[in-house]
């Protein structure tokens, strides 16, 4: 039987014009304005300003600052210099395929735009009920939680209220996830700030407020745990008012909803408030475009390979689309909604799980659907090349490398493998939060997936510790690591890793030398001896003094000499130590200018680890 010709439906979605987005900025003075893109060295800047390098160097020299041709001036310095030359200045950005995804813009006509679901981010302090609230909204009994009691991974979900969709982004609640929360706020239209009525605002509450303000988005405050006996909503209102989050009932413009996520109280009112704000702000997108959006989460899935949760921000995503996501690309093989139902299309504001990537994407990366695979691959490769250049530049940082080589700076090499991108990002964020003078950490490799032979071999050659977060090494890999002396550390709680890293960093430093005073003696009488010099007749006034111990000679409370005890006698017998309230005779090495009533302070030097020093 002859096969019927099945007519493929034409794809009318508009593709991004990549060439139109590419922009090369001409650096120079135009109509009294100096246009530039980034920090410049004096040798690069001078001709662009129509000045000689020596003139600029002399200008700084007169201010008491010594610069040379290779000195890099930052954007602020260049701006100040322009003003000194009576020039306006303007900072523009070169756009090429390496940074294209961060610089996508849309020139859609109003007629092409349609209403989309509001994107809502739930934020708040740990244990104030964010996850419970989200689970109650979804009418789900499943709460994904970390071993340490922290929501493990960012998730995105869509629910329906009165036939209208609302998309929620859930962000972890602990301080280690500050960057992840910040990224969530940048994606969002509305922030729900969860504050426990029995606890009030806390550190993460204030951080969330800062992120919401920075993103310039409306805030709805959900005063949770109103079912608690200790609930004090007035306290919460007053605390937030002090942070310029003023409730409508106090004359402000912020919606406050009081309720209990645990008992499903106030939830309907909260959703109504979201829909009202969405209606007032008229959120729109153009579904007739190839999709553009942001990676919420990514991991290596056993069944599907590299898997990413994507949030469509504009356009429509379809199964079979070619995507570039940061430094990787692929063709959508499978697409699932938040309930793991396989779907064919995703409209604006829809979160979906997508498989088909060459590598695991990075959470926070922008994605773009393109008309063909060749273009997607080319852009991804350019982004990857830029990433590799930056990594090489970091490794070749002469300042750090020189200090390490000279022993001025201690270093710990780490290889991190994690279950999902969100965990990896949080672990990497730990590095920047720990600042211990004299020691640094170098991240040799960080990736999603199990610990491999390649990781062990790299750790062996780079003298690195392997960190596995929610991933384990097989018995074969463990045996290999043991045989070559590579240490593998496993964690499932972020802050246990932080504590250990701090201990490792302190442990690499040379011990701190602490001086401990063990005794004091007062000089009562002096005796001159032709062979040994001045002998001090002393009484030990506290502690004890020991032969060969270090001493400070104090006169009227001022140290006049540092030396050590050369000889020590008690009742004409040579002894090793003399205790308090006993008299003794002693000599001080290389010092004879001692006087009666001088105090001899005896001390020892003790090595202590950095974590032992308060």
UniProtKB/Swiss-Prot annotation:
G1: annotated span: 124-131
Chain segments carrying region G3: 170-173
Compartment annotation: Cytoplasm
Function as written in the Swiss-Prot or TrEMBL entry: One of the essential components for the initiation of protein synthesis. Protects formylmethionyl-tRNA from spontaneous hydrolysis and promotes its binding to the 30S ribosomal subunits. Also involved in the hydrolysis of GTP during the formation of the 70S ribosomal complex.
GO cellular component term of the entry, any: cytosol
Organism in which the protein naturally occurs: Ureaplasma parvum serovar 3 (strain ATCC 700970)
Alphabetical list of Pfam families matching this protein: EF-G_D2 (PF22042), GTP_EFTU (PF00009), IF-2 (PF11987), IF2_N (PF04760)
Alphabetized UniProt keyword annotations: Cytoplasm, GTP-binding, Initiation factor, Nucleotide-binding, Protein biosynthesis
Binding site for GTP: 124-131, 170-174, 224-227
Protein name in UniProt: Translation initiation factor IF-2
Region of interest (G2), residue spans: 149-153
NCBIfam families, per the entry: IF-2, small_GTP
InterPro entries, A to Z: EF-G-like_DII (IPR053905), IF2_II (IPR044145), IF2_N (IPR006847), P-loop_NTPase (IPR027417), Small_GTP-bd (IPR005225), T_Tr_GTP-bd_dom (IPR000795), TF_IF2_bacterial-like (IPR000178), TIF_IF2 (IPR015760)
Organism domain of life: Bacteria
Entry similarity comment: Belongs to the TRAFAC class translation factor GTPase superfamily. Classic translation factor GTPase family. IF-2 subfamily.
UniProt-annotated stretches for the region G5: 260-262
